[in-house]
Amino acid sequence: MEEIIKLNSVDKYCELHGFETQHPLVAVVDMKDATEFPPEFTVNYGVYALFLKENLGCNITRYGRQKYDYQEGTVTSFAPGQVTHVVMNPDVRPQAKGLIFHPDLIKGTPLAREMHNYSFFSYSSNEALHLSDEEKQIFIDCLEKIKIELNRPIDKFSKRLISMNIELLLNYCMRFYSRQFVTREVQNKDVLTRFEALLDDYFAVNKPQ
């Protein structure tokens, strides 16, 4: 029977890929710095995670019971209780940047009360977020802000500032998702309009005499 790795902590995720744990409740990671690449594994998330995938170094073959729409240049998100099966591409070193944080990090903050509004964390969602080049840079800039805060000595403002920057990233992702679905709706409507025009032309030409 396949073993399921329980990612109940940030430290457990860092251990899986050979990262140094800077903070017990949050990590900003870059897969180019990873030293461990299990060829295939299944994880049960106990933390929140978002990843910007920059190449085809791995594939998520199962996300719950659905195949994940996960291509190059996309963001995927995971929440506590979700199960994911990952297969590494043996010919390509994975390139991805990501954020992992434990629910305890945001406990008692305004963000904790808003998490249910970030629908891209939903278990039923199997669609990745496809970013433009500008959006990718915004995503990376948000990660850098969090990373800068993690590199500072902890003080009474640390938790609040880290949480606020995570919330900023999540709000940007909501904006990007909205843009993605609006764009798709316009494209689908355009296709339907052209199809209806073709039908009108067909019936005009073939109208019974």
For the regions a language model picked out, list residue spans one by one.
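Generic protein-terminus/edge-of-domain signal
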Residues: 1-68
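Short, Lys/Arg-enriched, Trp-marked, Pro/Gly-tolerant hinge/linker segments that flank
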Residues: 130, 153-160, 175-208
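A cytosolic small-molecule/anion-sensing beta-strand core signal
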Residues: 54, 71, 80
